[in-house]
UniProtKB/Swiss-Prot annotation:
Residues 89-157, 172-217, 261-290 are annotated as: Disordered. It comes from the Eukaryota. Disulfide bonds: none annotated. Residues 106-124, 142-152 have a biased composition (Basic and acidic residues). It comes from Caenorhabditis elegans. Residues 207-217, 274-290 have a biased composition (Low complexity). This is Uncharacterized protein ZK353.4. Residues 172-183, 193-202 have a biased composition (Polar residues).
Amino acid sequence: MLEDKGELSIKEVLKCLPISEKSPANWAAWCFGLILVVLILIVTGYMFVVYLRSQRKKNQLADETGGIEIENSIRDPVVINNSLASRSCSENKVKKQSPESTEQDDFSKTTVDETIKEKSEKQPKTCAQKPKVPIPKASTPKTEKLVSKEPSTEELSVKNSLTDLKNEATKMANTSSSANRTGEISVEIVSPKPTTAVQASTPEKPMSSAESAMESSIGSDISTYIVSSKRSEVNNYNMIEAGRTPPMSFSESYAQTAIPTANTPPTVVHVSKPSSETSVSIPPSSAVKK
Protein backbone atom coordinates (compact mmCIF):
# COMPACT_ATOMS: atom_id res chain seq x y z
CA MET A 1 0.00 0.00 0.00
CA LEU A 2 2.73 2.29 0.86
CA GLU A 3 4.44 1.52 -2.41
CA ASP A 4 1.26 2.26 -4.28
CA LYS A 5 0.89 5.50 -2.40
CA GLY A 6 4.45 6.35 -3.24
CA GLU A 7 3.96 5.47 -6.88
CA LEU A 8 0.81 7.44 -7.05
CA SER A 9 2.39 10.40 -5.52
CA ILE A 10 5.17 10.45 -8.16
CA LYS A 11 2.73 10.07 -10.95
CA GLU A 12 0.55 12.79 -9.59
CA VAL A 13 3.55 15.07 -9.42
CA LEU A 14 4.50 14.36 -12.99
CA LYS A 15 0.96 15.05 -14.04
CA CYS A 16 0.97 18.34 -12.27
CA LEU A 17 4.14 19.47 -14.13
CA PRO A 18 3.58 21.33 -17.42
CA ILE A 19 6.10 19.10 -19.17
CA SER A 20 4.79 15.77 -20.13
CA GLU A 21 6.63 12.85 -21.53
CA LYS A 22 4.78 13.12 -24.75
CA SER A 23 5.98 16.75 -25.61
CA PRO A 24 9.63 16.76 -26.94
CA ALA A 25 9.54 20.51 -27.75
CA ASN A 26 9.27 21.35 -24.11
CA TRP A 27 12.29 19.22 -23.33
CA ALA A 28 14.42 20.99 -25.97
CA ALA A 29 13.45 24.37 -24.60
CA TRP A 30 14.37 23.37 -21.11
CA CYS A 31 17.78 22.03 -22.28
CA PHE A 32 18.55 25.25 -24.19
CA GLY A 33 17.69 27.31 -21.16
CA LEU A 34 19.88 25.22 -18.92
CA ILE A 35 22.81 25.56 -21.39
CA LEU A 36 22.43 29.35 -21.44
CA VAL A 37 22.44 29.47 -17.67
CA VAL A 38 25.61 27.38 -17.53
CA LEU A 39 27.36 29.60 -20.11
CA ILE A 40 26.42 32.72 -18.21
CA LEU A 41 27.80 31.23 -15.02
CA ILE A 42 31.07 30.26 -16.75
CA VAL A 43 31.56 33.76 -18.25
CA THR A 44 30.86 35.52 -14.98
CA GLY A 45 33.31 33.23 -13.18
CA TYR A 46 36.00 33.91 -15.78
CA MET A 47 35.48 37.67 -15.56
CA PHE A 48 35.66 37.51 -11.80
CA VAL A 49 38.94 35.60 -11.97
CA VAL A 50 40.41 38.13 -14.45
CA TYR A 51 39.39 41.00 -12.21
CA LEU A 52 41.07 39.40 -9.23
CA ARG A 53 44.28 38.88 -11.22
CA SER A 54 44.38 42.52 -12.39
CA GLN A 55 43.90 43.76 -8.87
CA ARG A 56 46.69 41.53 -7.70
CA LYS A 57 49.04 42.89 -10.38
CA LYS A 58 48.14 46.46 -9.47
CA ASN A 59 48.90 45.79 -5.85
CA GLN A 60 52.24 44.24 -6.78
CA LEU A 61 53.17 47.25 -8.95
CA ALA A 62 52.21 49.65 -6.18
CA ASP A 63 54.33 47.73 -3.72
CA GLU A 64 57.29 47.68 -6.11
CA THR A 65 57.11 51.42 -6.84
CA GLY A 66 56.85 52.19 -3.15
CA GLY A 67 59.89 50.04 -2.45
CA ILE A 68 61.84 51.73 -5.27
CA GLU A 69 61.00 55.18 -3.93
CA ILE A 70 62.10 54.16 -0.47
CA GLU A 71 65.35 52.76 -1.84
CA ASN A 72 65.98 55.94 -3.87
CA SER A 73 65.35 58.11 -0.84
CA ILE A 74 67.89 56.06 1.06
CA ARG A 75 70.41 55.86 -1.79
CA ASP A 76 70.39 59.54 -2.91
CA PRO A 77 72.25 61.03 0.08
CA VAL A 78 74.63 58.10 0.07
CA VAL A 79 75.34 58.58 -3.66
CA ILE A 80 75.85 62.31 -3.19
CA ASN A 81 78.26 61.75 -0.33
CA ASN A 82 80.15 59.15 -2.33
CA SER A 83 80.39 61.46 -5.38
CA LEU A 84 81.68 64.33 -3.26
CA ALA A 85 84.23 62.09 -1.64
CA SER A 86 85.40 60.76 -5.02
CA ARG A 87 85.72 64.30 -6.43
CA SER A 88 87.77 65.46 -3.47
CA CYS A 89 90.02 62.43 -3.79
CA SER A 90 90.52 63.02 -7.54
CA GLU A 91 91.34 66.70 -6.98
CA ASN A 92 93.89 65.80 -4.33
CA LYS A 93 95.47 63.29 -6.70
CA VAL A 94 95.66 65.88 -9.50
CA LYS A 95 97.25 68.41 -7.15
CA LYS A 96 99.82 65.87 -6.07
CA GLN A 97 100.57 64.82 -9.64
CA SER A 98 100.74 68.36 -11.11
CA PRO A 99 104.25 69.33 -9.82
CA GLU A 100 105.69 66.09 -11.15
CA SER A 101 104.12 66.69 -14.56
CA THR A 102 105.46 70.26 -14.68
CA GLU A 103 108.92 69.01 -13.77
CA GLN A 104 108.72 66.43 -16.54
CA ASP A 105 107.64 69.09 -19.04
CA ASP A 106 110.50 71.37 -17.99
CA PHE A 107 112.98 68.52 -18.28
CA SER A 108 111.69 67.61 -21.76
CA LYS A 109 111.91 71.25 -22.87
CA THR A 110 115.48 71.58 -21.62
CA THR A 111 116.52 68.35 -23.34
CA VAL A 112 114.97 69.52 -26.63
CA ASP A 113 116.76 72.86 -26.38
CA GLU A 114 120.09 71.15 -25.67
CA THR A 115 119.72 68.82 -28.66
CA ILE A 116 118.90 71.75 -30.95
CA LYS A 117 121.97 73.64 -29.72
CA GLU A 118 124.23 70.62 -30.27
CA LYS A 119 122.93 70.16 -33.82
CA SER A 120 123.45 73.84 -34.61
CA GLU A 121 127.03 73.69 -33.27
CA LYS A 122 127.85 70.58 -35.29
CA GLN A 123 126.57 72.00 -38.59
CA PRO A 124 129.21 74.19 -40.38
CA LYS A 125 128.33 77.72 -41.34
CA THR A 126 128.13 77.69 -45.14
CA CYS A 127 126.47 81.04 -45.80
CA ALA A 128 128.92 83.93 -45.81
CA GLN A 129 127.87 87.23 -44.37
CA LYS A 130 127.31 89.86 -47.01
CA PRO A 131 129.06 93.20 -46.50
CA LYS A 132 126.71 95.93 -45.44
CA VAL A 133 126.45 98.65 -48.06
CA PRO A 134 125.67 102.08 -46.63
CA ILE A 135 122.45 103.49 -48.00
CA PRO A 136 122.90 107.03 -49.29
CA LYS A 137 120.59 109.43 -47.54
CA ALA A 138 118.59 111.91 -49.53
CA SER A 139 120.21 115.29 -49.34
CA THR A 140 117.82 117.92 -48.09
CA PRO A 141 118.45 121.50 -49.25
CA LYS A 142 119.40 123.72 -46.39
CA THR A 143 117.31 126.84 -46.24
CA GLU A 144 117.86 129.67 -43.86
CA LYS A 145 114.70 130.95 -42.29
CA LEU A 146 113.93 134.59 -41.89
CA VAL A 147 113.74 135.29 -38.15
CA SER A 148 111.52 138.12 -37.04
CA LYS A 149 110.78 139.07 -33.47
CA GLU A 150 107.26 140.04 -32.58
CA PRO A 151 107.28 143.55 -31.11
CA SER A 152 105.67 144.18 -27.75
CA THR A 153 102.72 146.46 -27.09
CA GLU A 154 105.04 149.30 -26.06
CA GLU A 155 106.89 149.12 -29.37
CA LEU A 156 103.60 149.02 -31.26
CA SER A 157 102.50 152.19 -29.50
CA VAL A 158 105.80 153.90 -30.38
CA LYS A 159 105.73 152.83 -34.05
CA ASN A 160 103.98 154.78 -36.77
CA SER A 161 100.27 154.36 -37.39
CA LEU A 162 98.80 152.19 -40.14
CA THR A 163 98.10 155.20 -42.34
CA ASP A 164 101.81 156.09 -42.32
CA LEU A 165 102.65 152.50 -43.23
CA LYS A 166 100.18 152.65 -46.12
CA ASN A 167 101.76 155.84 -47.44
CA GLU A 168 105.23 154.29 -47.20
CA ALA A 169 104.07 151.16 -49.06
CA THR A 170 102.59 153.24 -51.90
CA LYS A 171 105.83 155.23 -52.12
CA MET A 172 107.80 151.98 -52.29
CA ALA A 173 105.59 150.70 -55.13
CA ASN A 174 105.97 153.95 -57.09
CA THR A 175 109.75 154.02 -56.72
CA SER A 176 110.03 150.35 -57.73
CA SER A 177 107.94 150.88 -60.89
CA SER A 178 109.91 153.95 -61.93
CA ALA A 179 113.48 153.05 -60.91
CA ASN A 180 113.79 149.26 -61.23
CA ARG A 181 111.79 147.48 -64.00
CA THR A 182 113.19 144.02 -63.20
CA GLY A 183 110.62 143.44 -60.42
CA GLU A 184 112.96 143.75 -57.41
CA ILE A 185 113.41 146.48 -54.81
CA SER A 186 116.83 146.91 -53.25
CA VAL A 187 116.66 148.01 -49.64
CA GLU A 188 119.79 148.62 -47.63
CA ILE A 189 119.66 147.98 -43.91
CA VAL A 190 122.67 149.43 -42.16
CA SER A 191 123.43 148.28 -38.64
CA PRO A 192 125.32 150.71 -36.40
CA LYS A 193 128.98 150.01 -35.82
CA PRO A 194 129.67 149.34 -32.13
CA THR A 195 132.55 150.99 -30.32
CA THR A 196 135.86 149.23 -29.76
CA ALA A 197 135.29 148.83 -26.02
CA VAL A 198 131.93 147.17 -26.49
CA GLN A 199 133.30 145.02 -29.33
CA ALA A 200 136.16 143.79 -27.14
CA SER A 201 133.94 142.97 -24.16
CA THR A 202 131.01 141.24 -25.93
CA PRO A 203 131.60 138.20 -28.20
CA GLU A 204 130.27 138.23 -31.74
CA LYS A 205 126.89 136.51 -32.26
CA PRO A 206 125.14 135.73 -35.56
CA MET A 207 122.41 138.25 -36.21
CA SER A 208 119.75 138.09 -38.89
CA SER A 209 119.15 141.17 -40.97
CA ALA A 210 115.41 141.03 -40.19
CA GLU A 211 116.00 141.84 -36.50
CA SER A 212 115.00 145.31 -35.36
CA ALA A 213 117.93 147.74 -35.54
CA MET A 214 118.52 150.89 -33.52
CA GLU A 215 116.82 153.01 -36.12
CA SER A 216 113.33 152.34 -37.51
CA SER A 217 113.23 150.66 -40.92
CA ILE A 218 110.64 149.42 -43.39
CA GLY A 219 111.20 145.78 -42.35
CA SER A 220 110.35 146.51 -38.72
CA ASP A 221 107.30 148.53 -39.77
CA ILE A 222 106.05 145.66 -41.92
CA SER A 223 106.58 143.21 -39.05
CA THR A 224 104.53 145.46 -36.75
CA TYR A 225 101.79 145.59 -39.36
CA ILE A 226 101.77 141.79 -39.70
CA VAL A 227 101.32 141.41 -35.93
CA SER A 228 98.49 143.94 -35.88
CA SER A 229 96.80 142.31 -38.90
CA LYS A 230 96.96 138.91 -37.18
CA ARG A 231 95.34 140.38 -34.10
CA SER A 232 92.59 141.95 -36.18
CA GLU A 233 91.99 138.63 -37.96
CA VAL A 234 91.60 136.88 -34.59
CA ASN A 235 89.15 139.54 -33.45
CA ASN A 236 87.14 139.21 -36.69
CA TYR A 237 87.06 135.41 -36.33
CA ASN A 238 85.78 135.70 -32.75
CA MET A 239 83.08 138.14 -33.87
CA ILE A 240 82.00 135.78 -36.69
CA GLU A 241 81.73 132.88 -34.23
CA ALA A 242 79.66 135.09 -31.92
CA GLY A 243 77.26 135.80 -34.82
CA ARG A 244 78.24 139.41 -35.44
CA THR A 245 79.56 140.95 -38.65
CA PRO A 246 83.11 142.32 -38.32
CA PRO A 247 83.68 145.95 -39.38
CA MET A 248 85.31 146.48 -42.78
CA SER A 249 88.50 148.51 -42.45
CA PHE A 250 91.29 149.52 -44.77
CA SER A 251 93.56 146.78 -43.36
CA GLU A 252 92.48 144.32 -46.07
CA SER A 253 93.24 146.74 -48.90
CA TYR A 254 96.56 147.57 -47.27
CA ALA A 255 97.36 143.86 -46.92
CA GLN A 256 96.89 143.50 -50.68
CA THR A 257 99.16 146.47 -51.43
CA ALA A 258 101.91 146.06 -48.82
CA ILE A 259 102.28 142.25 -48.56
CA PRO A 260 103.42 140.30 -51.64
CA THR A 261 101.03 137.81 -53.23
CA ALA A 262 101.27 134.03 -52.80
CA ASN A 263 102.47 133.62 -56.43
CA THR A 264 105.75 135.47 -55.79
CA PRO A 265 108.62 133.34 -54.40
CA PRO A 266 109.81 134.09 -50.84
CA THR A 267 113.12 135.84 -50.30
CA VAL A 268 115.91 134.38 -48.16
CA VAL A 269 118.08 136.75 -46.14
CA HIS A 270 121.48 135.39 -45.17
CA VAL A 271 122.83 135.81 -41.64
CA SER A 272 125.28 138.68 -41.30
CA LYS A 273 127.46 140.12 -38.63
CA PRO A 274 126.52 143.26 -36.65
CA SER A 275 129.14 145.38 -38.42
CA SER A 276 128.07 144.60 -41.98
CA GLU A 277 125.63 145.89 -44.52
CA THR A 278 123.11 143.62 -46.22
CA SER A 279 120.74 144.13 -49.13
CA VAL A 280 117.22 142.68 -48.98
CA SER A 281 115.26 142.06 -52.17
CA ILE A 282 111.47 142.30 -51.74
CA PRO A 283 109.38 141.51 -54.84
CA PRO A 284 106.45 143.93 -55.23
CA SER A 285 102.84 142.80 -55.49
CA SER A 286 101.35 142.11 -58.90
CA ALA A 287 98.52 144.62 -58.49
CA VAL A 288 99.00 147.72 -56.34
CA LYS A 289 95.88 149.49 -55.20
CA LYS A 290 96.21 153.21 -54.66
